C-alpha cells in the first residue's frame, strides 16, 4: 500500500519560443541585395526606395546599398541607397 497519495499531474509548464522579430540591420549599415532588414508582424515599418516586402511583411533590400530609416507623414520607412545619405 502506498504511504502517501500520488501527486497529480499538471497540464501547464510550457512556453512557446520567441519569433526573433525586429530590426536586423541598423541605420547606415551596408546590406547586400536580398538581405533582410526588418522582420515584423504587419507593417510597423513600410518599404521605401529599393526595399521589397515579403508575404509575412519582412522587409528586404533590392540592391546593394546603405540602409536609411525615415518618418514621413506619421509612417516609418526603410530605404536602401547606393551611396550613404
UniProtKB/Swiss-Prot annotation:
One example of a Gene Ontology biological process annotation: translation
Membrane spanning residue stretches: none
Origin: domain of life: Bacteria
One cellular component term from this protein's GO annotations in UniProt: cytosolic large ribosomal subunit
Gene Ontology molecular function: any one: structural constituent of ribosome
InterPro entries membership: Ribosomal_bL27 (IPR001684), Ribosomal_bL27_CS (IPR018261)
Keywords: Ribonucleoprotein, Ribosomal protein
Region (Disordered): 1-26
Comp. bias (Polar residues): 1-13
PROSITE patterns tied to this protein: RIBOSOMAL_L27
Protein family (similarity comment): Belongs to the bacterial ribosomal protein bL27 family.
Protein's name in the database: Large ribosomal subunit protein bL27
Organism: Mycoplasma mobile (strain ATCC 43663 / 163K / NCTC 11711) (Mesomycoplasma mobile)
Lineage: Bacteria, Bacillati, Mycoplasmatota, Mycoplasmoidales, Metamycoplasmataceae
Amino acid at each position: 500500500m502506498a504511504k502517501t497519495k500520488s501527486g497529480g499531474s499538471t497540464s501547464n509548464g510550457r512556453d512557446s519560443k520567441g519569433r526573433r522579430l525586429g530590426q536586423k540591420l541598423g541605420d547606415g549599415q551596408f546590406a547586400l541585395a536580398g538581405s533582410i532588414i526588418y522582420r515584423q508582424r504587419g507593417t510597423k515599418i513600410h518599404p521605401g526606395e529599393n526595399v521589397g516586402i515579403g508575404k509575412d511583411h519582412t522587409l528586404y533590400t533590392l540592391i546593394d546599398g546603405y540602409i536609411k530609416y525615415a518618418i514621413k507623414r506619421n509612417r516609418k520607412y526603410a530605404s536602401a541607397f547606393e551611396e550613404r545619405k
